[in-house]
A protein has these predicted regions:
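Short glycine-/small-residue-rich flexible loop motifs, especially phosphate/cofactor-binding loops
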Residues: 19, 65, 131
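AMP-forming adenylation/ATP pyrophosphatase catalytic core
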Residues: 77-84, 89-332
Length: 332
């Protein structure tokens, strides 16, 4: 029998359902430098990064948007669950219609220029509605499984990835209680994040959580949940969707992780792209390397990378009666 025909081109199944030409752009080197190397470097500094933020800033709405402009494209469309409000004379970034799938948190870096040139076609629909429309049009992605894995980490095994790419940063060390006593050993600081409870391997009368990563001593500091509460943080690389920082402190609802619950806070713009955020109640896992994003109702106002959590804001005996608000003890 004749040999089987060669497989169709990568995008052929999509091309059958669209009227658009496919154009490719090699950005592998840039992606490695701006996203993968950043991911590794942040873990080496004892921080917990979100690589999607770096990808959106430098790749999707950086290089890719500029490439679209070079092709004289009117817009760059992506599948993010978010909305752009163009009704008020300036562009506002709003949450997606599906609260379970909203992705506005990872888009806070978009300013007026970017929002003028992007489209989020599915942002006004729920995920269920989008799947239904895809089925009606016989699109092959209608039944595609969702994935929360890092796209550059095979099998979602980020631990093995870090051991391969930064073995010098993955060294065992002591687990200390808040008094400085060694109560166990950890497998490498990059494997832990503030607020984490699972996987510590310590038997104790009460549940213990990661309080902080002591990079200088390669030590993991743990303690009871009452030691976790923190009310303030400082963020860097701050972006304001309007393009202008507020001249006075503003009341906001803020998220400190992608799936975190919104929490009431006061946002104060500082100099040189910095901001200080003070929450009404302590949060238990404010983590350097993650983003803090400010909202007013459905509108995204600003966001930045958490740089610093003042030690003076650790919840001590005076705050034991006011429990910290947990955002989850899973790794980011």
């Amino acid at each position: 029998p004749p040999p089987p025909p060669p497989p169709p081109p990568l995008f052929s199944s999509r091309r059958r359902h669209t009227r658009y030409a496919d154009r490719s752009r090699g950005l592998g080197d840039v992606y490695k430098r701006q996203v993968v190397d950043y991911f590794v470097a942040e873990y080496c500094q004892g921080r917990t990064p979100n690589p999607c933020l770096a990808c959106n800033r430098h790749i999707r709405f950086g290089r890719l948007l500029r490439h679209a402009q070079a092709l004289d494209a009117s817009y760059l469309a992506t599948g993010h669950y978010a909305r752009v409000d163009r009704a008020s004379g300036r562009f506002r970034l709003r949450t997606g219609a599906d609260p379970q799938k909203d992705q506005s948190y990872v888009l806070y870096m978009l300013g007026q220029e970017e929002l003028n040139q992007v489209l989020f076609p599915v942002g006004g629909y729920t995920k269920t509605q989008v799947r239904s429309m895809a089925r009606q049009r016989n699109l092959p992605v209608a039944e595609k499984d969702e994935s929360m894995e890092l796209c550059f980490v095979s099998d979602d095994d980020y631990r093995r990835f870090l051991q391969t790419h930064a073995p010098e940063a993955v060294q065992p060390g002591p687990i200390l209680d808040t008094a400085g006593n060694e109560i166990g050993r950890h497998h490498g600081l990059p494997f832990y994040t503030v607020g984490q409870r699972r996987g510590l391997g310590i038997a104790a009368p009460e549940a213990l959580y990661v309080i902080r990563l002591d990079l200088a001593r390669n030590a993991l500091v743990v303690g009871p949940s009452r030691k976790l509460g923190q009310r303030a943080l400082e963020a860097g690389q701050v972006c304001y969707v309007s393009g202008e920082p507020p001249s006075e402190p503003v009341r906001v609802q803020a998220k400190i992780r992608y799936k975190a619950t919104l929490a009431s806070a006061t946002w104060t713009a500082l100099e040189e792209g910095q901001a200080r955020v003070v929450f009404d109640a302590p949060l238990r896992d404010i983590t350097p390397g993650q983003a803090v994003v400010a909202y007013q109702e459905s509108e995204v106002l600003a966001g930045g990378i958490i740089d610093y959590v003042p030690a003076s804001d650790l919840a001590g005996p005076g705050s034991e009666g006011k429990p910290a608000l947990g955002q989850g003890d899973q790794h980011a």
